[in-house]
Amino acid sequence: LKYMLATQMAAPNSPQWFNTGLNYKYDLTGPQQGFWYVDPKTGNLTPGEDSYSRPQPHACFIQSIDDDLVNEGGIMDLWVKEARLFKFGSGTGTNFSNLRGEGEQLSGGGVSSGVMSFLKIGDRAAGAIKSGGTTRRAAKMVILDLDHPDIEDFIEWKAIEEDKARALIAAGYPADFNGEAYATVSGQNSNNSVKVPTEFLKAIEEDGDWDLIARTDGSVMKTVKARDLWNKIADACLLYTSDAADDLLC
């Protein structure tokens, strides 16, 4: 392994370079920041001693989210977990399809503001860590099922924000990615993906309808043409993303 690394025949992922061996070589520790490990002797899940004795070596994490605002496992808790991963150089991805769509009823009365309002909060948080993180820019993936009530807004999110950025650039703001135009708009800090089931592809072939389903009671909130929705995905990938393999994956 040493020979392969020294001759550049192979290389570990970024968090390995950032974190592995810092305690062994330089006696770095740092505060315990929520790290856990499986003790090889007991098999028990155990809190880590500090940040670097048992470091964070993995590049990617998949996290779940509950349809809850402030409790553990909910929306705001996810931003804290993402920040912890970003700080030590890892990326994270989450399917947000559990969150209710815009207009769905809340248990305490009123209606939900929808998944997009919370995605924009997470996008801003990632953007801040991208600028001030200790290792590299934040990297995250956002996934939404194709039957989510807010799927159309999700598909067009980056396209609309890109139009805003172009308008600002045309007005004289700098066009570089770190400039004021792109810092002003949202949706710039994640790869967005849609989860496409086989049933949807069959609906495209048959020119059929596609139902958007409420998360609270399973009722149909809206029905769209499958081909129209598919064309929105294609347009967003073709016209407004830097790499269709990275954004709005199908």
Q: For each predicted feature, which ranges?
A:
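Extended catalytic cores of very large enzyme megasubunits
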Residues: 1-246
